[in-house]
Design a protein with these regions (language model features):
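Active-site rim beta-loop-alpha module in soluble metabolic enzymes
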Residues: 132-189, 197
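N-terminal glycine-rich anion-binding loop in soluble enzyme alpha/beta folds
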Residues: 1-54, 119-160, 251-252, 256-267
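A C-terminal functional module that forms or caps the active site or interfaces directly
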Residues: 183-204, 208-212
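Glycine/small-residue-rich loop that forms an oxyanion/phosphate-binding "nest" at active or ligand-binding sites
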Residues: 60-105, 109
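Short, acidic/turn-prone active-site loops that include or flank metal/cofactor-
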Residues: 98-103, 118-122, 212-217
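Glycine-rich, highly charged phosphate/nucleotide-binding loops
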Residues: 48-65, 164-172
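Short, flexible loop segments at boundaries between secondary-structure elements
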Residues: 209-230
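Short, structured coil segments at secondary-structure junctions
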Residues: 31, 90-93, 109, 135, ...
């Protein structure tokens, strides 16, 4: 089975991150599962609502192409899940958002969730996201690291000091959350999620830290397996009515007619 993993970072500027992510997903994927990791250019480089909207349009377009190219599942690898519902209504293959899958998983581990996100700009977006998923009462803290994707490059290239520095900053954001009642910590982004992936059983005080990269991959694998077993798919009523082919063609016509190029494939 083949999974298309859509990141919102630039494939050249964040090459160390995408290479590490691809290798990590390859190492934990179920037998017979291949994950293709793709970025975007221009990436989500000017954080804010307009950039989220622009990147979501490209992600939706890539998702439509991915299904036509025979992929079995799609992961929206951007924690804010911009375009998730639109993708789910455009595709018949399983579509998983890193944010949605991780928040629901974290909600099983504790009552009060603290989110550590990449930048303070995203803080309000995560509160809105939690409300959208019916988890608004469970998200008690959100704090931005004030980083950009390239700040992680040295750590993902093997610089131990850079990794330790990033982990210290992550802990600085998370520790006050735990002190004031959060009992689960969520890295609200695959960049910090991948950073903590090598820290087995990582905790801030008593609070487990949820690795969103592994949660998203195992979630899409589960839904692909359930679709094969039971034929289950999203509701095609009001929530995720399937877009007709003309609607998809009209959408694609609004964007440059270029298919995503293959960059990284994990066997």
């Amino acid at each position: 089975m083949r999974i298309f993993w859509q990141s919102f970072v630039d494939e050249e500027a964040s090459a160390p991150y995408l290479a590490r992510l691809s290798a990590y997903l390859s190492g934990i994927a179920a037998p017979g599962v291949t994950v293709d990791v793709r970025g975007l250019s221009p990436s989500d480089r000017d954080f804010g609502r307009l950039a989220e909207f622009r990147c979501s349009m490209r992600a939706i377009s890539n998702g439509i192409y991915a299904e036509r190219d025979g992929y079995d599942g799609f992961v929206l690898g951007h924690f804010q899940d911009s375009g998730l519902y639109e993708l789910r209504s455009a595709l018949t293959i399983p579509v998983v958002g890193v944010g949605e899958s991780t928040l629901f998983a974290a909600a099983q581990l504790g009552r009060r969730l603290g989110l550590v996100t990449l930048d303070p700009t995203f803080e309000i977006l995560h509160y809105e996201q939690a409300d959208r998923y019916g988890l608004g009462g469970r998200i008690t803290h959100v704090k931005g690291l004030s980083f950009i994707p390239q700040d992680f490059s040295a750590a993902f290239e093997g610089d131990a000091e850079a990794k330790a520095r990033l982990l210290r900053r992550f802990a600085e954001c998370a520790e006050p959350m735990v002190a004031s009642g959060a009992d689960v910590i969520v890295p609200a982004g695959v960049l910090p999620g991948l950073l903590v992936a090598s820290e087995r059983a990582y905790r801030i005080g008593y609070a487990p830290v949820v690795n969103c990269a592994s949660v998203a991959l195992k979630s899409v694998e589960m839904w692909m397996q359930l679709r094969a077993l039971d034929g289950i798919e999203p509701s095609r009523g009001p929530s995720f009515a399937l877009a007709p082919e003309r609607a998809k063609a009209d959408f694609q016509a609004t964007l440059a007619p270029t298919k995503p190029s293959a960059r990284r494939q994990t066997p």
